[in-house]
Amino acid sequence: MTEQRPIAVLGGGSFGTAVANLLAENGHAVRQWMRDPEQAEAIRVHRENPRYLKGIKIHPAVEPVTDLLETLTACDLCFVALPSSALRSVLAPHAERLAGKLLVSLTKGIEAQTFKLMSEILEEIAPQARIGVLSGPNLAREVAEHALTATVVASEDEELCERVQAVLHGRTFRVYASSDRFGVELGGALKNVYAIIAGMAVALGMGENTKSMLITRALAEMTRFAVNQGANPMTFLGLAGVGDLIVTCSSPKSRNYQVGFALGQGLSLEDAVTRLGEVAEGVNTLKVLKAKAQEVGVYMPLVAGLHAILFEGRTLNQVIELLMRAEPKTDVDFISTSGFN
């Protein structure tokens, strides 16, 4: 089904561009909004986003634009791919225009000042809008290169989920639905922290046993925290949980993994982020997650360890020693064992 009105993608980064291309390839007119007029002109002229997706041709049906008000007026369905630090400031001035719109967040981050997820910010800005999130093991370049990929659209609004499935589902991109918006979105935000740890481990030459341990203990930490916050633990066994965690912690294409790898090579955090040239949400998420875990009393040793390295002056060897000497806990402690007695 082709949408009668154009579809908006807000954000000129790598994943926003990949989603814009998918929509256009499925026969939809797309308005991709970005702040930078030079970036918009480069895409318009060269049909490529050289800064974020170099070498990927942009479909002719993707129109790069810089007028946000006009874009919101023209489009009913909007995919929001703005950095977590910018989402509120960009959209709040246009709150009235968002009423009744279908807003689907693509951003895997947490607002530092409030610990709100992106869909919660959208809900706060535009309470009359219909809100969803899209999350999963979706590396932007692989999506753009048509690697076989699956994702999850999550909302309690079934019609919104069906609309998103209809416009995005294609021969290489499969869209599943979930009603656990909070769990799907939280999983996407939390895993970025562990990708930094995984990148560091690889740069330091740690073995496959270590990488496997990190991923599985990361899943335990994520799920423990998510259950404390009210999410469904089963969500973390799906694409938006363990699926996203595996790809982000295993692939050099992952931005957060790249930051961790650079740190493992001896670069400072500032230099690692500068070398990346894009937003790595995991760095910001780490700060707020460490504070929140302490506040609510959730045991997250990997989060605490990475925070100690990046912000408290601890060395990696010191943190490893503390982690390995800590009292062993149960392996899977977020599922009730009452049925096994």
UniProtKB/Swiss-Prot annotation:
Pathway: Membrane lipid metabolism; glycerophospholipid metabolism. Pfam families: NAD_Gly3P_dh_C (PF07479), NAD_Gly3P_dh_N (PF01210). The active site is at K191 (proton acceptor). NADPH binds at S14, F15, R35, K108, A140, R255, V279, E281. Its main location: cytoplasm. SUPFAM superfamilies: 6-phosphogluconate dehydrogenase C-terminal domain-like (SSF48179), NAD(P)-binding Rossmann-fold domains (SSF51735). It comes from the Bacteria. Keywords: Cytoplasm, Lipid biosynthesis, Lipid metabolism, NAD, NADP, Nucleotide-binding, Oxidoreductase, Phospholipid biosynthesis, Phospholipid metabolism. Belongs to the NAD-dependent glycerol-3-phosphate dehydrogenase family. Its EC number is 1.1.1.94. It is found in: Cytoplasm. It is an enzyme of class 1 (oxidoreductase). GO terms for cellular component: cytosol. The lineage of its organism: Bacteria, Pseudomonadati, Pseudomonadota, Gammaproteobacteria, Pseudomonadales. GO terms for molecular function: glycerol-3-phosphate dehydrogenase [NAD(P)+] activity; NAD binding. GO terms for biological process: carbohydrate metabolic process; glycerol-3-phosphate biosynthetic process; glycerol-3-phosphate catabolic process; glycerophospholipid biosynthetic process. Sn-glycerol 3-phosphate binds at K108, G136, K191, D244, S254, R255, N256. It catalyses: sn-glycerol 3-phosphate + NAD(+) = dihydroxyacetone phosphate + NADH + H(+); sn-glycerol 3-phosphate + NADP(+) = dihydroxyacetone phosphate + NADPH + H(+). This is Glycerol-3-phosphate dehydrogenase [NAD(P)+]. Catalyzes the reduction of the glycolytic intermediate dihydroxyacetone phosphate (DHAP) to sn-glycerol 3-phosphate (G3P), the key precursor for phospholipid synthesis. InterPro entries: 6-PGluconate_DH-like_C_sf, 6PGD_dom2, G3P_DH_NAD-dep, G3P_DH_NAD-dep_C, G3P_DH_NAD-dep_N, NAD(P)-bd_dom_sf.
